[in-house]
Amino acid sequence: MKITNPVLKGFNPDPSICRAGEDYYIAVSTFEWFPGVQIHHSKDLVNWHLVAHPLQRVSQLDMKGNPNSGGVWAPCLSYSDGKFWLIYTDVKVVDGAWKDCHNYLVTCETINGDWSEPIKLNSSGFDASLFHDTDGKKYLLNMLWDHRIDRHSFGGIVIQEYSDKEQKLIGKPKVIFEGTDRKLTEAPHLYHIGNYYYLLTAEGGTRYEHAATIARSANIEGPYEVHPDNPILTSWHDPGNPLQKCGHASIVQTHTDEWYLAHLTGRPIHPDDDSIFQQRGYCPLGRETAIQKLYWKDEWPYVVGGKEGSLEVDAPSIPETIFEATYPEVDEFEDSTLNINFQTLRIPFTNELGSLTQAPNHLRLFGHESLTSTFTQAFVARRWQSLHFEAETAVEFYPENFQQAAGLVNYYNTENWTALQVTHDEELGRILELTICDNFSFSQPLNNKIVIPREVKYVYLRVNIEKDKYYYFYSFNKEDWHKIDIALESKKLSDDYIRGGGFFTGAFVGMQCQDTSGNHIPADFRYFRYKEK
């Protein structure tokens, strides 16, 4: 049996892999998307399904106003003492000299249960992780952020003991590893294996130069000796490898005594207009999760098949377990809660944003702020998980002025998105409008207004993603579809396009309603269809 990479498709970065008995879990970053943290489950490392979003309450994660690519960075999931432990960072400032961020701990006895209220740990840097040593002691590690002009901002990896009894950090933090010449040392995970403590970190930045570095020491506080063939994982030297950006990793030992590495990766597309500065391409699906097998030599881990990472990997000697899909091809909103694959921006889906019961078998969204807001958006979306898919919805919406709009959106962040929306024109009544936001530059390229007939109840909207391009379609009866012949570029919904690669999420598609007049007019969505080709 083979593991086929990536195992978690679409925006699922910074994997923290964990074993509890014979069950395996991967927690990934969600940044500004709510609920916070995605946890996937597997029995065999081959087949995975989404099972939990542990940060469900504003008391656990308050992101209103957080910047693009702020929010939850690099969670660390572990299992010890009969319960799950989750460390996460909430990043409040991403630009400038300072990186204002706060590290928290929540726990739960079951992976999909009601997670505890958070314990605030520190704010000295991001990518925090919790290490449970064999002697019962626990330690927090994180990268240290240094804002000083004459210093490198990545100041090394710090460690500090955590007292579970007192529910706080004790003692003094200590820098135990300053990194290698690759710089940008982050994402620490510590393991006590045999005679050594192994410190796994990410280096080189989370673009194409990304890498996983490992060092070891006989003492937890160091000094740490770097792997003789470091980095143990990177695709920087192999631009033709289908898995790029390989780095930010974590290690698991299976119950069959085999070793694996879960890591971040990206699968670029190469549009015809690629410049020399983007010869590595663009990754609209965001940073995904892959798994490699490890072997040991001279008490050092190595990646089977080469440090660049492989698409196919030998699976562990565990019987296969296949799960049902976590989303239907067509979601007709029959449940009282949103499907687990849907998320909202920064804030939870509450009665303020919408309802699944006020209009039975509909998702009702109340108009709020625009797609450029970082506060209150009525936007329910899911990840692009393929570069070949269709997404479709039907919306009943009766706007009364031009400030009210509802429809289908493809979104990266507040500065990069496209939307096909029902809105209002003073002379024509209900119309369809295509709006493009390209690095915060706006356009509405339809030369001829698309007027919606008065008798039409539902307006049907569809998007077809065709790898490096995508197109919108509309219908007034679900049978006769009209293509809007404007090719939109998938690359513009990628980390690599946004300000030259300074952001960290991926493309989403979903349903949105805005009302900047402040009247909160509702839009009713009859279904949402997502079908990969």
Curated annotation (Swiss-Prot):
It catalyses: Hydrolysis of (1->4)-beta-D-xylans, to remove successive D-xylose residues from the non-reducing termini. GO terms for cellular component: plasma membrane. Induction: Up-regulated by xylose. Subject to carbon catabolite repression (CCR). GO terms for molecular function: xylan 1,4-beta-xylosidase activity. It is a peripheral membrane protein. GO terms for biological process: xylan catabolic process. Transmembrane segments: none annotated. Its main location: membrane. It is found in: Cell membrane. Keywords: Carbohydrate metabolism, Cell membrane, Glycosidase, Hydrolase, Membrane, Polysaccharide degradation, Xylan degradation. SUPFAM superfamilies: Arabinanase/levansucrase/invertase (SSF75005), Concanavalin A-like lectins/glucanases (SSF49899). Its EC number is 3.2.1.37. The keyword Metal-binding does not apply. Belongs to the glycosyl hydrolase 43 family. This is Beta-xylosidase. The lineage of its organism: Bacteria, Bacillati, Bacillota, Bacilli, Bacillales. The gene is xynB.
